[in-house]
Amino acid sequence: MELDIKGIMDRLPHRYPMLLIDRVLEMVPGKSIVAIKNVSINEPFFTGHFPHHPVMPGVLIVEAMAQASALFSFTDENGGLKCDGAKTAYYLVGIDGARFRKPVVPGDQLRLEVEAERLSCTICKYQGRALVDGQLVAEAKLMCAIRSLEE
């Protein structure tokens, strides 16, 4: 299953400048996702990180992995939504083993590959990898909490 930016925005509450997924190339709901972030010099974080040598902050690469994980966790087997995004919050609550191997710079296309390790109604665990031109630039284990906003 693929998603364009409209499908992504239908599923994620994030908006500019915090929406860090541009396209979904492959998605197996509840199992895995491959998504793309096109890194442009126009990203607001490049203004201060760093003006003379722009590098995408590692924490935003991890956030992009978390957003990718939310996309496939909230999509059912038929491509529909499992929950009402307006009534559900998805929080990044843990990061283990994060490693940043190479800098991500303007002009790079960040390929995000995330696999589910454990999914439940309240806590989910994932293994995420980020690649540029087939080379590993970052990896991390993620833990996310799902909460109803009506509680």
UniProtKB/Swiss-Prot annotation:
Superkingdom field: Bacteria
Alphabetic keyword roster: Cytoplasm, Lipid A biosynthesis, Lipid biosynthesis, Lipid metabolism, Lyase
A single GO molecular function term of this UniProt record: (3R)-hydroxyacyl-[acyl-carrier-protein] dehydratase activity
Family matches, as Gene3D superfamilies: Hotdog Thioesterase
Family stated for the protein in its record: Belongs to the thioester dehydratase family. FabZ subfamily.
Function: Involved in unsaturated fatty acids biosynthesis. Catalyzes the dehydration of short chain beta-hydroxyacyl-ACPs and long chain saturated and unsaturated beta-hydroxyacyl-ACPs.
UniProt protein name: 3-hydroxyacyl-[acyl-carrier-protein] dehydratase FabZ
Organism: Bordetella parapertussis (strain 12822 / ATCC BAA-587 / NCTC 13253)
Taxonomic classification: Bacteria, Pseudomonadati, Pseudomonadota, Betaproteobacteria, Burkholderiales
